[in-house]
Regions:
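Walker A/P-loop-proximal flanking segment of P-loop NTPase domains
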Residues: 1-66, 70-81, 446
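P-loop NTPase motor core
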Residues: 9, 14, 64-127
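Substrate-engagement module of ASCE P-loop NTPases
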Residues: 122, 158-169, 196-216, 529-532
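Extended alpha-helical interface modules used as scaffolds for assembling large macromolecular complexes
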Residues: 238, 290-528, 539, 553-557
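Sensor-1/coupling segment of RecA-like P-loop NTPase cores
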Residues: 183, 193-234
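Conserved P-loop NTPase mechanochemical-coupling segment
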Residues: 8-17, 102, 109, 113-156, ...
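Amphipathic alpha-helical segments of the small helical/lid subdomains adjacent to P-loop NTPase cores
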Residues: 228-233, 241-300
Length: 557
């Protein structure tokens, strides 16, 4: 493998270019945004880890009047558009601010973090304090923001102030670039101070974007398009580019051509199929897209010998709480759809693009929309659809192996947590009393409460069996060597000197359950699973269990 510097976790365009990091050219984003009629406000939404921050850093470096960016962009696609470069490169005062990490368990701590981030950002503009054309009143507010003593009203109007001061100084209206605008609202929704943070963000957006005579245009990014009436009230000439939009569809994330080039440059063409299975599968507008964070993380790890096989990088960047809350909300209808998705199928749903964080969990439709818009699901391509869809509906699927693993891990954890809360005493009593009929009844009852994955293969039932005994004071072993073979699940009640041995079989039909049960018992006998326990346990109970979807049959040896 060739030694390349992959910019994992680096979203600063200038640092990537000057530091010699590997870069996939996405500067056509600039052409797309600046060609033709420019919207006063453009909102771009993409899932996390798809390059939004790097895209905004690229745009800011291109426009910033205080920089000389010609060398930074030399050799890139945008440099070939000489007319556009002459008109726009380093011609605009720029306000570039990211709301990333604006978080806190309380409103006070989150607001304090916001004020600190604003103070750091304003340090880059202290040259404005030396301009005699700017009023002392404006300079006073600027200094209070810098010193974190500004009133809340002054904080809400901070970008209005900054654009006005920049216009006075440069005699040009300013471009405002706001990255991850919805992070403070999302965190507030999770931590119980939604209305307070919404009030701050709505006022900040309104003062910056509405009737601001010092604003040339603005670009705002986030994960979700919050309903206009919630946060962008009164904003005129407002354009949104979501994952449904064809424009900018290749500007965030890697195309197949991008990945092919990366693998060629790295000398890793042999990894193409695995990378595609794990990190491809997103369909944005008209484009098929890979998650860029995953691809460069995998290539970096492969380069340094950290990982030779693909793994989930997404799950390490968030707690994936949206899936868990979705499962907790699940009724029978949602459960059936989740099982279809996790078995590799697709479901048809209406997608609501205009959401508010306080109503994300208010309906099944909203929950499916959030899973789609945040990248946990993707659209089935039109050419792959067997039938036409109702207006406003999309066929949704899990995009790749990485996201499927996240779903499976979350479902497994949900089952383990849920099982501890269920009344399992009747099931345990049936196990230790040798009552196979009662055990059949209790097992079936619990099966109907689960969300299956692996398309009802035996590994699902192994996980189910082990999970219902976990956290109940027993020692649970799964697929350890015993006797002359491998028993599926062993449950040891050491205090009472007893052990239960379970062998599970999957039946292809409901009618075949008895035969599958008999086969499980026969295997216990033939492979002598009980032999290892005769010296240490007084009671050894052996059960053959046969499963068919969410039905089971238990027989005792």
């Amino acid at each position: 493998m060739k030694d390349l510097q992959f910019p994992v976790g680096i979203s600063n365009f200038e640092k990537i270019r000057e530091g010699g990091y590997y870069y996939i050219d996405k500067t056509n984003l600039i052409s797309e945004l600046l060609s033709g009629g420019i919207a006063e406000v453009t909102l771009i939404t993409r899932p996390r880890r798809f390059g939004k921050s790097l895209g905004m850093s690229t745009l800011a470096n291109f426009l910033d009047i205080r920089k000389d960016s010609k060398q930074m962009f030399e050799g890139l696609a945008i440099s070939k558009n000489t007319e556009l470069c002459k008109k726009w490169m380093n011609q605009c005062p720029v306000v570039f601010f990211s709301f990333k990490d604006t978080d806190g368990l309380t409103f006070e701590s989150a607001y304090g973090m916001l004020c600190m981030k604003l103070a750091f950002a304003f340090q880059d503009y202290q040259f404005l304090l030396d301009d005699d054309a700017i009023s002392d009143d404006d300079k006073g507010i600027f200094k209070r923001i810098l010193g974190r003593t500004a009133s809340m009203d002054e904080t809400k109007s901070c970008f209005l102030l900054l654009t006005r001061m920049l216009e006075i100084h440069f005699k040009k209206s300013a471009v405002v670039i706001l990255d991850e605008y919805d992070v403070p609202i999302a965190k507030a929704s999770s931590n119980g101070y939604y209305s307070q943070m919404l009030d701050v963000m709505r006022a900040m957006m309104s003062t910056t974007l509405k009737d601001n005579i010092s604003l040339d245009f603005a670009v705002v990014t986030g994960c979700l398009k919050i309903a206009k009436e919630s946060i962008f009230t009164g904003t005129n000439n407002f354009v949104s580019d979501t994952i449904l939009s064809p424009r900018l569809s290749e500007s965030f994330g890697f195309t197949q051509a991008d990945v092919d080039q990366m693998l060629k440059d790295a000398g890793l063409e042999s990894q193409s199929a695995e990378i595609k299975a794990w990190y491809d599968g997103y369909h944005f507008g008209d484009a098929d897209i890979y998650c860029p964070w995953d691809v460069i993380s995998y290539l970096r790890d492969f380069q340094y010998g950290v990982a030779q096989k693909p793994k989930s990088y997404w799950k390490n960047t968030s707690d994936n709480a949206i899936i868990r809350s979705f499962i907790d909300y699940a009724g029978d209808n949602i459960t059936t759809k989740l099982e279809t998705l996790m078995a590799g199928g697709s479901i048809v749903q209406h997608i609501e693009e205009n959401l508010t964080y306080d109503y994300l969990h208010s309906s099944e439709e909203n929950l499916w929309s959030v899973l789609y818009l945040t990248g946990y699901l993707t659209k089935v391509r039109d050419k792959d659809l067997a039938d036409s869809l109702p207006d406003g509906c999309s066929a949704l699927m899990i995009p790749n192996a990485e996201i499927r693993e996240i779903f499976e891990t979350t479902v497994s954890k949900w089952f383990d947590d849920s099982a501890k809360a269920w009344n399992r005493s009747p099931l345990f009593d049936a196990v230790w009393s040798g009552n196979s009929e009662a055990l059949t009844k209790e097992m079936t009852k619990l099966l109907r409460m689960t969300i299956s994955y692996h398309d009802y293969r035996e590994d699902f039932y192994h996980a189910f069996l082990a999970g219902i005994f976990t956290g109940a004071g027993y020692v649970v072993e799964s697929n350890k060597e015993h006797g002359e073979g491998r028993s599926d699940v062993i449950v040891k009640d050491i205090r009472n000197g007893r052990v239960a041995i379970f062998e599970a079989k999957y039946s292809k039909t409901l009618d075949a359950l008895p035969d599958a049960c008999d086969a499980a018992i026969q295997q216990i006998n033939d492979r002598m699973y009980a032999a290892d326990f005769r010296d240490d346990y007084d009671d050894i109970l052996c059960y053959g269990i046969a499963f068919f979807k969410k039905r089971c049959m238990v027989r005792k040896k």
